[in-house]
Every structure is written in structure tokens, then in C-alpha cells.
Amino acid sequence: MSQLSLTLLMIVAAYLAGSVSSAVLVCRMRGLPDPRSQGSGNPGATNVLRIGGASSAAMVLFFDMLKGALPTYLAYLMGIDAISLGLIAIAACLGHIYPVFFGFKGGKGVATAFGAMAPIGDDLAICLMASWVVLVLISRYSSLAAIITALLAPLYTWWLDDRFTIPVAMLSTLIIIRHKDNIKRLLKGEESKVSRKRRPKIP
């Protein structure tokens, strides 16, 4: 199989993998409301945290990151070039954002994008996760943390392994574009802060 054919095959596979909505499936499995119609309406880990608690959100985060990491890392093992790896990672994110299996109504693609970046190295994964966590703790805005971390990601990559700076910049651009409405709400002071759903106390 030619390099072009292999790349196209992996792009399709990545999109289909990304189209599996972890948030919707985890909520169904746990008897929670559909995240597309509750909370912020975004089927992602942050909204699942709001409506279902930390354990459900952690499951969604793990599987959303896995959707980005697996196809990208497999493509890397196949010897696919860096720019094509970026396209494959973007395909996984587009699957998450516009999932063919769930009516093309998906999430922001942040966890999937960070998952696609993670195989570059443990040091990059730690930098990304630490940046996001610290920014959320300081600001209480998941969207702001995602935007700033996306802006930092190409700089981290250039510093740690500059071969993948362009693919990471491609993913960062997608994340920022996807957050355009959040940016408008942040500027207006209307963005929702992160808060975990409080369960009723048992008498």
C-alpha cells in the first residue's frame, strides 16, 4: 500500500474512532441525562462533571483522549510523516466534533486533541495536563484553560521535540476555532465556571 493510501485510510479510521461519543455512552451506561441536552449542552468531560460527577467525567476524559492517541500513535508506528500525522489527529478531532454516529453533534475536541499530542512524549503530556489543571484551578473556566493550553502547546512541542511543532499547531488552531463562542462569552463575562454536581444528602 502506498504512503498516500495508508494516510487516507488512517484519516478515515481516525474520524470514525473520533465519532464514538464517550460522553453520551458513559451517561447512558450510568443512567445520567444526555449531555447534549443538559448543562452546557456539550458532550465532553467538563459537562459530564457538571451533571454526573467526577468518576463519570474521568471515564469520558480517558476515552476521549484515547480516541486521539490511538490512531495518531498507530500512524506514527507505520512511519507516516509528521504533517500527515497532524491531518490524522485533526480527523479524530473532527469525528469528536461532528460524530457521524451521533447526528453530527459533538464536543469541542480538546481531550481528543490533547490525546493525539500525548504520544509525542510523556514530558509534553505532563506539561499540557499541568497547564490545564493549574489554569482551571486559578480561573475556574475550563474553556479558558483549554484555549491558553492550546496556545502553549506548540511552544512546548518546539521546546521538547520540534519535529511535531507544525502538527501540534494545526491541532491548537482547531481547538481555538472551536472555542470561538466561548471566547465571546468570556469577553462578555457570561461563560459558565466549572462546578461539580452536588448530589443530595441522604437523611
Swiss-Prot record:
Its EC number is 2.3.1.275. GO terms for cellular component: plasma membrane. The chain crosses the membrane at residues 6-26, 82-102, 118-138, 141-161. Its main location: membrane. GO terms for biological process: phospholipid biosynthetic process. One of its GO terms (molecular function) is acyl-phosphate glycerol-3-phosphate acyltransferase activity. Pathway: Lipid metabolism; phospholipid metabolism. It catalyses: an acyl phosphate + sn-glycerol 3-phosphate = a 1-acyl-sn-glycero-3-phosphate + phosphate. It is an enzyme of class 2 (transferase). It is a multi-pass membrane protein. InterPro entries: G3P_acylTferase_PlsY. It is found in: Cell inner membrane. SMART domains: G3P_acyltransf. Keywords: Cell inner membrane, Cell membrane, Lipid biosynthesis, Lipid metabolism, Membrane, Phospholipid biosynthesis, Phospholipid metabolism, Transferase, Transmembrane, Transmembrane helix. Probably interacts with PlsX. Catalyzes the transfer of an acyl group from acyl-phosphate (acyl-PO(4)) to glycerol-3-phosphate (G3P) to form lysophosphatidic acid (LPA). This enzyme utilizes acyl-phosphate as fatty acyl donor, but not acyl-CoA or acyl-ACP. Belongs to the PlsY family. PANTHER family: GLYCEROL-3-PHOSPHATE ACYLTRANSFERASE-RELATED, INNER MEMBRANE PROTEIN YGIH. This is Glycerol-3-phosphate acyltransferase. It comes from Shewanella oneidensis (strain ATCC 700550 / JCM 31522 / CIP 106686 / LMG 19005 / NCIMB 14063 / MR-1).
